Swiss-Prot record:
HAMAP family: Lipoyl_synth
Official protein name in the record: Lipoyl synthase
Pfam families from the UniProt entry: Radical_SAM (PF04055)
Subcellular compartments: Cytoplasm
Cofactor binding mode and count: Binds 2 [4Fe-4S] clusters per subunit. One cluster is coordinated with 3 cysteines and an exchangeable S-adenosyl-L-methionine.
Lineage: Bacteria, Pseudomonadati, Chlorobiota, Chlorobiia, Chlorobiales
Organism field: Pelodictyon phaeoclathratiforme (strain DSM 5477 / BU-1)
Domain annotation Radical SAM core: ranges: 50-266
């Protein structure tokens, strides 16, 4: 059954839950004045993840230099300078939360000479100094294709190197006009071929793509050395953002999961609420395909 935009279908109604872990996570993040993509991007899984004591840390502030039409993060051509104490603050938060796996991401900072790569390096090193047994996933921007900036981060050998293609190439002009599909694929290939990293990428669906286009993009990811993939429903953050073209059914997400698994991905998460870092810790522990609960 096809669901066009309008009232959200039942499977997209979030079951809110919170408790001691949720409150503790919020207090800790507020105390250290830390940013998370959970809040900045209005992630639908915030309640669940914080209740499990997990969060995805957002580096380089909360203002992005790109104008992607799907994203709720603030935008400006000249954001405030990064906080030099941010790496230390994040490392302390990882220690306080007793995390075994941490996910780092950042806004895109085209205003900085290296796109913020040195801050990435400083944060990874600060975390490992204070938390030597923590595994790290880095969800990085494209650094405008700057290979030196990419290499700075990749040379730190995070356990997972994540970079999202976000959508199919035919929608790039409409969805993320300042990005380049081929650049994203080359980044993933570089992480695999030059640095031997475990690689991951993600897509949103429901923005006007076809199932055939999704299948082709999954094939492109595999051809460029991508090991893991996440597929989730695009949800419009506000009336100013790109509207949802269609709500993808749970059955369709299962079909995407089955196709991606059969195509050769090591890990697959596919479901309405799946986001790039959703249950990221599970991917460091399991060898089978991971499916998101609906």
């Amino acid at each position: 059954m096809e669901h066009v935009p309008g009232k959200k279908p039942e499977w997209l109604k979030i079951r809110l839950s919170s408790g001691a872990s949720f409150a503790s996570t919020k207090r800790l993040l507020d105390r250290h004045s830390l940013h998370t993509v959970c809040r900045s991007a209005m992630c639908p899984n915030l309640q669940e993840c914080w209740s499990r004591g997990t969060a995805t840390f957002l580096l380089l502030g909360t203002v992005c230099t790109r104008n992607c039409r799907f994203c709720a993060v603030g935008k400006a051509s000249n954001p405030p300078a990064p906080d030099p104490r941010e790496p230390e603050k994040i490392a302390l938060a990882v220690h306080s939360m007793q995390l075994k796996h941490t996910v780092l991401t950042s806004v895109t900072r085209d205003d900085l000479p290296d796109g913020g790569a040195e801050y990435w390096v400083a944060t990874i090193r600060a975390i490992r100094t204070l938390n030597p047994f923590v595994t790290i996933e880095c969800l990085i921007p494209d650094f405008e294709g700057n290979e030196r900036a990419m290499d700075l981060v990749m040379a730190e050998l995070p356990e997972i190197l994540n970079h999202n293609i976000e959508t199919v190439p035919s929608l790039y002009t409409k969805v993320r006009p300042q990005a380049n599909y081929a650049t994203s694929l080359r980044l993933l290939q570089r992480a695999k071929e030059m640095h031997g990293l475990t690689t991951k990428s993600g897509m949103m669906v429901g923005m006007g793509e076809t199932a055939e286009e999704v299948a082709i993009s999954l094939g492109d990811l595999l051809l460029h050395g991508c090991d893991m993939v996440t597929i989730g429903q695009y949800l419009q953050p506000s009336a100013l953002h790109l509207p949802v073209e269609r709500y993808i059914t749970p059955e369709e997400f299962e079909q995407y999961r089955s196709f991606a698994e059969g195509a050769g991905f090591r890990h697959v998460q596919s479901g309405p609420f799946v986001r790039s870092s959703y249950h990221a810790e599970a991917l460091t522990k399991k060898t089978e395909t991971v499916c998101s609960p609906i």
